[in-house]
Amino acid sequence: MTRVCSVWLSLLLVACGAADPGASDGATDPPASDAGAEDAGPPPRTTAPTLPEPTGACPETFANGRVTVSPEGIAPREVQVWIGDAAAEQDGPLIFYWHGTGSRPEEAEYGLGPDTMEAILAAGGMVVAPIRDPEAGDFPWYLTAGTGDDDLRVADEVVACAMETVGIDPMRIHSIGMSAGGLHTTQMGYRRSSYIASVVAYSGGLYLPRLPPIEDPANRFSALMFHGGESDVVIIGFEDATERYHADLTARGHVAFICDHGSGHTIPTAARASVWAFFQAHPFGAESPWSEGLPADFYAPCGLTP
């Protein structure tokens, strides 16, 4: 029945010309709601990521502009890369950015902001915004309204090849996205918890009765999630989807922060400095230093509870 409802909803979204739907889960995904309620407690925390290995030919290097990766089992895909000279001297963070429907990879520059982009590159890191596969359909990412793992395979190949060529900090692999990209980032946190350190979702979350599978339950990654209040609605209500996402992670023992910026379906640009501070404070496997509350200078609408 879940699969039938998902197909019907996808058709409805197309008919309505929506900019972004919610994410759809397959019938094999585990049931939602009280995910950890029957457990004796969370497992011991994972302290080291499990990194993917290259499955195809890696690019010679990662440089500014478009780079092609070749994951096994799917056609080669391009990604947009931002990287600086500092990457030759130090292994910095890798930030994946997933744009919204109708947008472009360059949205990363707006979603992160110029100061954060500069800081990431100065730390020897890079930002990678995958290019959508037209075969994904009306929405940019397979997990926005389906169950295909193609985009996750692209991310895996980027991680593996970046480690092999330019070098990255394996403890600082993060994901961020807006709308369809926020929904994808939500999925990626669960489905690639073997290496994702922490995530930020602008108008993302969970909206169907079933949850995505979690790859490594022992990686209790932290999440920073935003919604724009009651008016943050594009077919689905992102306020409700975000609150459900927050409830599930906290039930699993994760530290999750939720922010109502009150400006509808938009990226809260005033929060961008706090997004970078959040990523810096939450490497892989670490206890959140903010588990009792956020710093005084953090973006004001954010907190531990809705």
Predicted regions and their residues:
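Soluble non-cytosolic domains of exported or imported proteins
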Residues: 92, 111, 145-153, 190, ...
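Alpha/beta-hydrolase fold nucleophile elbow
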Residues: 167-179
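Bacterial signal peptide processing site
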Residues: 17-20
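Serine-hydrolase catalytic machinery in alpha/beta-hydrolase-like enzymes
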Residues: 59, 73-83, 87-170
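A domain-start/cap signature at the N-terminus of enzymes
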Residues: 23, 32, 36-94, 125, ...
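C-terminal motif of bacterial Sec signal peptides marking the signal peptidase cleavage site
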Residues: 13-15
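Bacterial N-terminal signal peptides that target proteins for export
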Residues: 1-8
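The feature captures the conserved acid-bearing segment of alpha/beta-hydrolase catalytic domains
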Residues: 197-276
